[in-house]
Structures are given as structure tokens and as C-alpha cells.
Amino acid sequence: MYKRFTAICFSIGLLLSYSLAYAGVVTHHFKTLDLTAEAEYQTGNPDKPAVLIMHGFLTTNQFHTIKATVQAFHDAGYTTLAPTLTLNINKRRQSVKCNAIHTHTLEQDQLEISEWIDWLEKKGHKQIILVGHSSGSQELLALLASRKDPFIKLAIFTSLFYLNGEELGTNPAELDYSKKALEAKNNQPHKYSFLFCHNNYYATPESFLSYQKLDRQYILEQLRNLEVPNYTIMGSEDKRYKSVGNNWLDELKQTGTNLVIIEGANHFFSSEYEFDLQDQLVQITNNHFNQP
């Protein structure tokens, strides 16, 4: 009888603790950029790590792959933080179109991500997992190359490719133009081809060039040298293999990352593959931290 009463009290206490959990939008001001960004923050079990989840190129934390990732970790009891990069837009909430004026840089993105990690640490989180989708994975990988943080315990990259390569549509003449423009101190916006933006990516040379370091060789090298335990999750039916070649998966595996391939999934893990992604994310994390 006493044991049953104790169990009931424990269950009530657990329910009360979750009822006091925070879930909502938080803001952070970047002093050096004079910009404020928003993030969705949900507290979970304090004994579990916190997960920072980074969206892909020009999107927000409302993108369906990010929402699914957040939901998976939240349902498993993990604290989650999903920021939206400002891209030089104060409190940005919408995706940015190709033909908008792009003045943001990779360095600014990394500064924002780094300060969000600091934000989590100031909240008392001593175990942090970094999860990225698409270019969000590349940006996290680039950040980890320079940030040696004992509180970052695990990194999971999903749909990890690269941003610069003629096979992706990068035009060498446009790269040459941008370099010469900066040398001449001309930072006026210009139209480029960049990823899914065909001849209509309207960016300053500084902005455009900053992302070009994320080429095939750089991504593979950083992944090979990464000291943080890491996994890379890829969809077997990602259309980007048509551009980069199916040997990309072999090259990823050779870096030493723990490669997981979800059969049938596309770049965004759409439809039923969303659940496969969620299962893999939680399974990887639970196993790594010996969670039940």
C-alpha cells in the first residue's frame, strides 16, 4: 500500500514538473550586430541534455523538417532550442527569397549560433547536442572547427552536403567578379547563381563569397578532423546526389562520421520518412547518453 502511494505521489510530482515547463519564443540581442533574433525554447527533463537545432538556407525554425526534429526531441524529454538566423533582418520570422538583398555572411551566422550556445550554457545546460539540417549542418560543422567547447557532447548532421562547386551550379566567373569587386572596395549587390537560386540570388560580393568556403573539400576535411562525437543522417533518395554523385555517401563514411542512411527519404525527410528521421534522432541520442 505504501509503495503504491509513493508511486502515485511520484507520478503527480512528475506531472506537476512538466506543467511548470517553459515552451515559447525567446529573444536574444547580438550587440556586435545590433540585431535581435528569436528562437523557440522548450524545457524538458533537467537530467537530459539540451538540443540546439539549426535550420537550412534562407528558411526559419518553422520549416517542417525542423519542426519535426524539435517535436521528436521534446517528446523524448529533451530541452530544445531552435533559433532563426537573422540574415541581417531584425526578429526575422519569414523565409528570405532569392531576389531579396542578401548582406548576411557566414561569419555572422556563426556568431549568432555561438551566442545561442552561450545562451544555453548560461541557462545551466552542461550537456549540449547540436543538430543541423542541410546548410544548417554545414554551418554547425564550420563553427565546431573553431569552437572547442567541453559542453558540446554530440553533433548530428542531416542532409549534409556543401555549397560551392561547379556541379552545384557555381559559376567561376561570378566568383572571380566578387573577388575583384571586393578588391576594388565595391560591395554593391549583384545577381548570382547559388544553390536553388538560379541567376537571381541578389547579394553583396562579401555576402556571396563568405559562404563559398563551404566546398566539398572543406566539409569532408572538417568532418574528418571533428573531435566531437558525431552522426550524419542522409536520405537515400536525395535528388542532390544527381549533382554531387552517389560517391558522396562513400566520402562521408570515410571521414569516420557515423553514417546513417534512411532508405527512400528525400532531402527533407518528407511524408512518412519524417517519422524515420525522428526515430533515428532519438535512438542515436538515447544510446549516446545511455538514456532509457
Predicted regions: what they are:
Residues 87-104:
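Cap/lid segment of the alpha/beta-hydrolase catalytic domain
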Residues 22-44:
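N-terminal cap/lid segment of alpha/beta-hydrolase-fold proteins
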Residues 9-18:
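Bacterial N-terminal signal peptides
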Residues 1-9:
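Bacterial N-terminal signal peptides that target proteins for export
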Residues 131-136, 140:
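Gly/Ala-rich beta-loop-alpha elbow adjacent to hydrolase catalytic centers
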